[in-house]
Structure formats: structure tokens, C-alpha cells
Regions:
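Hydrophobic targeting/anchoring helices
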Residues: 1-51, 149-159, 166-177, 190-192
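A short, well-structured beta->alpha microelement
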Residues: 56-75
Length: 192
């Protein structure tokens, strides 16, 4: 049946709504398998993230996998992308670790967002303790992680706000979630 279906589509590319780039340290090298290890055995550290990659496979998106070196070699690679996804725990190959110390990476992604590109972070995206921040894109995401360095800072931005994006949604379920994440003062909180 697969061969018949393949013959019928004649190599035609399906309609894609947007182009989505999964950003990690592997890029194309581990495309579609970036949250699986050792023949997809269950791993507590990454099983929560595998569903994100899996959901992309059935969505009407043109999905590409890029790494940080791709951005350094050709910052224009982001010009053709609508949304970047950075998924995983901090300081891992999933999210980038020390790559976030490179100002060209930060500048390229901030420019991408400033020019209307979307970015989705799940887990600890851009998470790497450096220059007084844990999330290197804290000002883009509007959140920071408490790692003990800012315990004495006031963190009073807890009020939730209504937003059209949640109007027809059921209760938001974040799954396991991450602890010690707080909103920055000017961030608009939709759900905690």
C-alpha cells in the first residue's frame, strides 16, 4: 500500500503552513531522533520532550533541523524560517549549552524574533549560566530560572492576564513542568 500511495503522489511536496526549525547541537545529523537514545529506550531525562518532535511529524509544517554552527556559518539561514524550537534541559546538546555564550548566536536569534520570527522554548531553552543569566534568551522568553544567584530579588509578577489565544482552550496542562521559573517584571503571564 505504501508503494501505491507513493506512486500516486508522484513526489509532490505536501502543503506546509510554516517552516519550523528545531535548533540543537546536532542539526541534520540526528533529525527526527534527537530525543531518543539507545534504540528509543525510555529515559526519564528526555521522554517528556519526545512528544514535541513526534507531533511535528504529522503537522502541516516544513520541518528542518539546524545546529548552532549552521547559524554561525550562515546567519541568513534564519531568513527562510518562521519558527525556531529549542527543546530540552539546560546544558545539554538538546538546548545548546556553551553555544549560548557566543554573541553571534544570541544576536542572530534576537534579530530573528525582532523581525517577526517565532520562537518556542520547552524545558530550559537557551539554559546555560553565563553573564548573570541562566536563560540566555531570558528577555525574549520573559522568564528566568532561579538558580540561587537572584534569591534576594523581588519577583512579584504573578498576575495572570486574559488573552485571545486561550479563549477557546481547555485548561492548560504543562505536564511535569519545570521548577523555579519566574516571570520577568514586564512579561505578560497567561497561565502559571
Amino acid at each position: 500500500e505504501f508503494r501505491t500511495l507513493y506512486a500516486n503522489v508522484k513526489g509532490t511536496t505536501p502543503y506546509c503552513v510554516k517552516k519550523v526549525a528545531v535548533l540543537n547541537c546536532w542539526g541534520k545529523m540526528r533529525a527526527w531522533g534527537c530525543h531518543m537514545v539507545h534504540h528509543a529506550l525510555y529515559q526519564k531525562q528526555n521522554y517528556s520532550y519526545a512528544g514535541i518532535i513526534e507531533s511535528l511529524s504529522g503537522a502541516p509544517f516544513d520541518v528542518v533541523f539546524i545546529n548552532f554552527q549552521d547559524i554561525l556559518d550562515n546567519p541568513a539561514i534564519l531568513d527562510d524560517i518562521d519558527v525556531i524550537i529549542n527543546v530540552g534541559d539546560a546544558d545539554t546538546a538538546h538546548t545548546g549549552g556553551e553555544w549560548w555564550e557566543n554573541p553571534q548566536i544570541i544576536e542572530s536569534i534576537r534579530r530573528f524574533v525582532y523581525n517577526g520570527g517565532g520562537i518556542i522554548g520547552v524545558g530550559e531553552p537557551s539554559g546555560h549560566q553565563y553573564q548573570g543569566h541562566f536563560f540566555q534568551l531570558a528577555n525574549v522568553f520573559g522568564v528566568e530560572e532561579e538558580t540561587g544567584f537572584t534569591l534576594g530579588y523581588d519577583k512579584y509578577n504573578w498576575d495572570e492576564h486574559e488573552h485571545f489565544i486561550l479563549e477557546d482552550s481547555e485548561e492548560v496542562d504543562f505536564g511535569e513542568g519545570k521548577k523555579n521559573i519566574y516571570a520577568l517584571p514586564n512579561a505578560t503571564i497567561l497561565v502559571q
